[in-house]
């Protein structure tokens, strides 16, 4: 089970809800993923405009936990305002803190992320910050009291997969809160690898919404996350430079 604060989830796959070809495909992909946590950008939702289309209306919200995010924020103050807007609209008090420091790479601003996380913790939010794979920054966020750490595998939407597995493994090793690999996942292989490293979960969006068949890809990601987790728990064999026969020498037939 994935445990975030006082909540437990059977699925370790968190799914983003942006950029799907249609509401219908989005709904089918969400269902196929069997994800229980759905994230979305508050700024791109028509929360207070009932006349405008809203993907939340297409879903059975009793089945999902909503994870609003502060995408579009460039300062801690902006992120806090967006989080409060989400809470005021009756959405979940969990918030994914996302403060972008570079428009080209979409990498997070470490200083503003720390500031926003600290303020939102003081306001009583369940805080899940999107961060880089900086090991020290991850530790500082945990020391603040965040409820999960969400290091990026690579830049948002890049599909490059896990660029720095060593740093991710360091973050996972030191963390006492869930580590959810977020951003840059491009294929089921990437999702499985993140879980094999020991991550507690994977959050992805573009890998599914941008696939030729988002519904099938959502299903593939579900199985990849499950396989990676099982592989991690089972324990892989150590790598060696030379081959080792799988058949024992003892009792070998002499011909």
Curated annotation (Swiss-Prot):
Cystine crosslinks: none
Binding site for 1-deoxy-D-xylulose 5-phosphate: 157, 183-184, 205-206
Gene Ontology terms: cellular component: cytoplasm
A GO term for molecular function: thiazole synthase activity
Domain of life: Bacteria
Pathways per UniProt: Cofactor biosynthesis; thiamine diphosphate biosynthesis
Keywords: Cytoplasm, Schiff base, Thiamine biosynthesis, Transferase
GO biological process assignments: thiamine diphosphate biosynthetic process
Pfam families: ThiG
E.C. numbers: 2.8.1.10
The UniProt record lists the keyword Transcription: no
Active site: 96 (schiff-base intermediate with dxp)
InterPro entries xrefs: Aldolase_TIM, Thiazole_synthase_ThiG, ThiG
Catalytic activity entry: [ThiS sulfur-carrier protein]-C-terminal-Gly-aminoethanethioate + 2-iminoacetate + 1-deoxy-D-xylulose 5-phosphate = [ThiS sulfur-carrier protein]-C-terminal Gly-Gly + 2-[(2R,5Z)-2-carboxy-4-methylthiazol-5(2H)-ylidene]ethyl phosphate + 2 H2O + H(+)
Subcellular location, record wording: Cytoplasm
Family membership noted in the UniProt record: Belongs to the ThiG family.
UniProt-listed HAMAP family: ThiG
Functional description taken from the UniProt entry: Catalyzes the rearrangement of 1-deoxy-D-xylulose 5-phosphate (DXP) to produce the thiazole phosphate moiety of thiamine. Sulfur is provided by the thiocarboxylate moiety of the carrier protein ThiS. In vitro, sulfur can be provided by H(2)S.
Quaternary organization: Homotetramer. Forms heterodimers with either ThiH or ThiS.
Protein's recorded name: Thiazole synthase
Organism: Bacillus licheniformis (strain ATCC 14580 / DSM 13 / JCM 2505 / CCUG 7422 / NBRC 12200 / NCIMB 9375 / NCTC 10341 / NRRL NRS-1264 / Gibson 46)
Upper classification of the organism: Bacteria, Bacillati, Bacillota, Bacilli, Bacillales
Gene name linked to the record: thiG
